UniProtKB/Swiss-Prot annotation:
InterPro entries: Citrate_synth-like_lrg_a-sub, Citrate_synth-like_sm_a-sub, Citrate_synthase, Citrate_synthase_AS, Citrate_synthase_euk, Citrate_synthase_sf. GO terms for biological process: carbohydrate metabolic process; citrate metabolic process; tricarboxylic acid cycle. Signal peptide: none annotated. It comes from Glossina morsitans morsitans (Savannah tsetse fly). Pfam families: Citrate_synt (PF00285). Its main location: mitochondrion. One of its GO terms (molecular function) is citrate (Si)-synthase activity. It catalyses: oxaloacetate + acetyl-CoA + H2O = citrate + CoA + H(+). Belongs to the citrate synthase family. This is Probable citrate synthase, mitochondrial. Pathway: Carbohydrate metabolism; tricarboxylic acid cycle; isocitrate from oxaloacetate: step 1/2. It is found in: Mitochondrion matrix. Homodimer.
Length: 465
């Protein structure tokens, strides 16, 4: 039986009543219920819960905004509602209340596998429930059935020059998929706003199903002279089909892909890609247009290119200090990097203040499957050396490694050497979180986003009062 998880810790009487109401819906949902059925049963009670919460506490002040926050990328401003995940500075990301280690324990794995299936994580993000293995297999089959690309998108992908960046191809193909948007058609036909979520859900399921085919086509066209299978095997899970279409057949790489697609899926709602999807979606752009916009943000070097920068830095380090540098050589190179005005890529995070659990689970995977790999051993040495040096500078709030410090090393080990492609993998994964959030945006009837902006002159006048 599925496990129902409530995402709030508030103990207000009205919330407790609504929780009981929500539980009454859940009691009638069997372990074999479809994802859509489970979600549909939860939405009315959640709508009522949010409605009553806003009615009772709508004027509650969440914090203050400073001038530095406005000029500093809005860091720390509490201004968004995202149900799918919350990032704790000390514990890292929690998906609907579950940490990454907890997800690894309770989410179903493939037969013979150990890592959680992304289908199960999507179920968790969308419903707040841990699904049964049967429910996860149901999602795998449904995504396989929805995966075929329309011919105009296939033609488009095959006509792109191989010199076009993979993320440009990815974004363009996703945009072109909106030709068949069910939400756009329903909106044009005058569907009632209470039904918006249903059509956003359908588009999101279609899009997630098609992304591995789009991404694999880009990979094969750009790096394999078009060679590769684009056929979907309905007996395989989402990740296994993706790996097969990419042209890889190592079961351990498939396990890595399941882990990778799970841990990169969501990271609150304030990062560039997640916020962009929410923002564009708030204008009632369909999921294809909204997600494509988010992918254009992910393509930016400050967001989705970090794991490439880590690998470039590691290769430069090896070139200068050798493939097996001593601790003293590492310290010398790291200080050289810092004194030149650069950062050590893969270290630090805007929110986290401890080692990123996404780094930790990748390290555990490497320790199990590739402990003697030269690049992994170098990353392990750096893990010991960098934090104390960054602490010594006194300028870094978080000296610990983040997810990007490790992911590229694992992909390199299994033969995926094409660094320009890594952000596409990130994008395929990120769809799980941002599209689950987009469904809830429409289910809760969130309005178009329109914050107030001020000029520097006006700010100066305000502080002089």
């Amino acid at each position: 039986m599925s496990i129902y998880r409530i995402s709030t810790t508030r103990k207000m009487p009205e919330v407790q009543k609504l929780n009981a109401l929500l539980a009454s819906y859940v009691r009638f949902i069997s372990a074999d219920s479809s994802l859509r059925d489970v979600l549909a049963a939860k939405i009315p009670a959640e709508q009522e819960r949010v409605k009553n919460f806003r009615k009772q506490h709508g004027s509650f002040k969440m914090g203050e905004t400073t001038v530095d926050m406005m000029y500093g990328g809005m860091r720390g401003i509490k201004a968004l509602v995202t149900e799918t995940s919350v990032l704790d500075a000390d514990e890292g990301i929690r998906f609907r209340g579950l940490s990454i280690p907890e997800c690894q324990k309770v989410l179903p794995a493939a037969d013979g596998g150990e890592e959680p299936l992304p289908e199960g994580l999507f179920w968790l993000l969308l419903t707040g429930e841990v699904p049964s293995k049967a429910q996860v297999k149901q999602v795998s089959r449904e995504w396989a059935a929805r995966a075929a690309l329309p011919q105009h998108v296939v033609t488009m992908l095959n006509n792109f020059p191989t010199s076009l960046h993979p993320m440009s191809q990815f974004s363009a193909a996703i945009t072109a998929l909106n030709h068949d948007s069910k939400f756009a058609k329903a909106y044009s036909d005058g569907v009632h706003k209470s039904k918006y979520w249903e059509h956003v859900y359908e588009d999101s399921m279609d899009l997630i199903a098609k992304l591995p085919v789009v991404a694999a086509t880009i990979y094969c066209n750009t790096y394999r002279n078009g060679k590769g299978s684009k056929s979907i095997d309905s007996s395989l899970d989402w990740s296994a089909n993706f790996v097969k279409m990419l042209g890889y057949d190592d079961p351990k790489f498939t396990e890595l892909m399941r882990l990778y697609l799970t841990i990169h899926s969501d990271h609150e709602g304030g990062n560039v890609s997640a916020h962009t999807v929410h923002l564009v979606g708030s204008a009632l752009s369909d999921p294809y247009l909204s997600f494509a916009a988010g992918m254009n943000g992910l393509a930016g070097p400050l967001h989705g290119l970090a794991n490439q920068e880590v690998l470039v830095w590691l290769r430069k380090l090896q070139k200068e200090a050798g493939s097996n540098p001593s601790e003293e050589q590492l310290k010398e190179y790291i200080w050289k990097t810092l004194k030149s005005g650069q950062v050590v890529p893969g270290y630090g995070h805007a929110v986290l203040r401890k080692t990123d659990p996404r780094y930790t689970c990748q390290r555990e995977f490497a320790l199990k499957h590739l402990p003697n790999d030269e690049l992994f051993q170098l990353v392990s040495k750096i893990y010991k050396v960098v934090p104390p040096i960054l602490q010594e500078t006194g300028k870094v709030k978080n000296p610990w490694p983040n997810v990007d410090a490790h992911s590229g090393v694992l992909l390199q080990y299994y033969g995926m050497k094409e660094m320009n492609y890594y952000t596409v993998l990130f994008g395929v994964s990120r769809a799980l979180g941002v599209l689950a959030s987009l469904v809830w945006d429409r289910a809760l009837g969130l309005p178009i986003e329109r914050p107030k902006s001020l000029s520097t002159d006006l700010l100066m006048k305000m502080v002089q009062k």
